A protein has these predicted regions:
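Switch/communication elements of ASCE P-loop NTPase nucleotide-binding domains
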Residues: 36-39, 43-46, 52, 66-183
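Coupling/switch segment of ABC-type P-loop NTPase heads
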Residues: 1-54
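Short secondary-structure junctions
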Residues: 50-64
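A generic structural signal for short, non-catalytic loop/turn and secondary-structure boundary residues
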Residues: 1, 60, 176-179
Length: 183
């Protein structure tokens, strides 16, 4: 999967073949402020929410700063920026941990695809075991009234599998935390 840097320019027409390396996911996120502002909010929620990945980062796109008339003054363009919750420092994806940029295309796809198939190899690549557990929740935590994507996952992560099995057991035993959806 690619890691966009400061020179990344989103394709205004993301293509199907760009999903294999994550390019189309970054394109969609960069362009989401113009077309689907809910997407960037959902992805940012996955990164910042304590009950999800809890990475202490929010995500913004250059379009959110309302500087379309003269973005060159601040050096911002339609790109994705990570912002640490406890500071105002804006970072490009290549300036944060590799694991965050590797998991972002999966989170983006999970919030775009409905009634489709998302195939991914090693979603656990370069991420901490605690984040791997949250990825297990990403695969299972959808409201029942939402058209869910089907995930085809090739993984070596015991953490992801154990989280999914835990959610299945909690659903079966009626012990699922209130904030979670049944599996």
């Amino acid at each position: 999967r690619i890691i966009p840097d400061s020179s990344f320019t989103p394709n205004p027409y993301p293509e199907q073949n760009g999903w294999f390396d994550g390019t189309s996911a970054w394109d969609k996120l960069c362009l989401s402020q113009q077309n689907d502002s809910a997407l960037i909010k959902k992805v940012s929620d996955w990164f910042s929410n304590r009950d999800k990945l809890n990475t202490n980062y929010n995500i913004f796109s250059g379009g959110e700063f309302d500087i379309k008339t003269s973005p060159q003054l601040l050096g911002l363009k339609d790109n994705v920026y990570f912002c640490k919750i406890d500071s105002s420092q804006m970072l490009f994806p290549n300036q944060v941990g590799v694991g965050l940029t590797q998991i972002a295309p999966l989170i983006i796809a999970a919030n775009i695809v409905q009634d489709g198939l998302i195939a991914i190899e090693q979603p656990e690549l370069h991420i901490h075991p605690a984040l791997q557990l949250a990825v297990g929740d990403l695969f299972t935590q959808y409201p029942l009234d939402v058209k869910r994507p089907m995930f085809l996952v090739e993984t070596h992560s015991e953490h992801i599998l154990l989280r999914i099995l835990k959610r299945i057991r909690q659903t079966t035993d009626n012990e699922l935390p209130e904030s979670n959806y049944p599996v």
